[in-house]
Design a protein with these regions (language model features):
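Bacterial N-terminal signal peptides that target proteins for export
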Residues: 2-15
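A residue-level marker of the well-folded mature domains of exported/periplasmic proteins
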Residues: 29-283
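Bacterial N-terminal signal peptides
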Residues: 13-23
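Sec/Tat signal peptide C-region and signal peptidase I cleavage site
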Residues: 23-29
């Protein structure tokens, strides 16, 4: 590999507030906020970033919160969300795409609770949705990958073929080809948000096929670690993963949810919450 070019730049998404009002004009006592996580918190990744936002929310608002991690996208998610609502959580954040239908179902039984779902597309009378235009960061990291590759083969470890993941894949290769028309992208699907073993295996396969820059849409650090082990480059996702690949890690698109969580809870407390759809980005 040649000496790394000075193109690396941390990319971040600061989610703007979702203007959300359950009981129009009536302030609400918010004693606890619930968070549902699809993977373990760990110390990097999608869930880790949401948990950082939760902690920031507690510190800024004085409202306590609780979470349940590693909740599967199925009937167990419905049970966890329902239990949070039954115990009186006035705001519940469900942070994975597959929770959407389960949260919508529960929301109809608890009209005085604010339900907020990440990355989905269905809304209800008291259920809003939020996401970020992650593809914007993907494009920029693709530019870096396109400049850094020597083999012109890029590798992508992906979870599920849902719109958000496909957007990221398309943006990444478009960014790469904007500076390197010869760049090609190979994708391996692991059908899991968090499976370090599969993520590592997919990374090794991609590198054996000639990929010298890897990225991922999964929740562990396995891809960055595999690239470090093999002397290749990697682009992190969700978090700064440079400590897992001091030589490999070029840059990362990082997610920052604290401002969104703070403003959402404050709006519920003030009584001016209403369910809306947020899709934040750079503009």
């Amino acid at each position: 590999m040649t000496v790394r070019k000075t193109l690396t730049k941390k990319l971040s998404f600061a989610c703007v507030a979702l203007a959300i009002s359950l009981l129009a004009g009536n302030a609400a006592a918010v004693d606890n906020v619930g968070f549902v996580y699809v993977t373990p918190i760990g110390d990097a990744g999608w869930t880790y970033q949401h948990n950082l936002g939760r902690v920031e929310m507690e510190e800024a608002t004085g409202v306590t919160s609780s979470y349940v991690e590693n909740v599967a996208e199925g009937a167990d998610a419905e049970r966890v969300i329902r239990e949070m609502a039954k115990r009186g959580d006035k705001v519940i954040f469900a942070t994975s795409f597959g929770y959407m239908n389960y949260m919508l179902k529960v929301s109809k039984k608890f009209p005085d609770t604010a339900f907020v779902h990440a990355t989905g597309y269905k809304m209800g009378d008291n259920m809003g949705i939020y996401n970020a235009r992650f593809y914007e960061g993907r494009y920029l990291t693709g530019v870096i990958a396109g400049e850094m590759t020597e083999s012109n083969v890029l590798g992508y470890v992906a979870a599920f073929p849902i719109p958000e993941v496909l957007q990221g894949i398309n943006a990444f290769i478009q960014g790469a080809r904007s500076v390197n028309p010869k760049a090609e992208l190979r994708v391996i699907w692991v059908n899991s948000w968090f499976d370090p073993g599969k993520e590592r295996q997919a990374s090794m396969t991609l590198m054996s096929q000639g990929a010298d820059v890897l990225t991922h849409h999964t929740d562990s650090t396995a891809v960055v670690q595999a690239a470090e082990e093999k002397g290749k480059y990697a682009v992190g996702y969700h978090s700064d993963m440079s400590k897992y690949g001091p030589t490999a890690h070029l840059t990362a698109t990082t997610h920052h949810w604290g401002d969104f969580y703070i403003k959402t809870v404050e709006q519920v407390k003030a009584g001016n919450w209403k369910p809306e759809s947020l899709w934040g980005g750079y503009a």
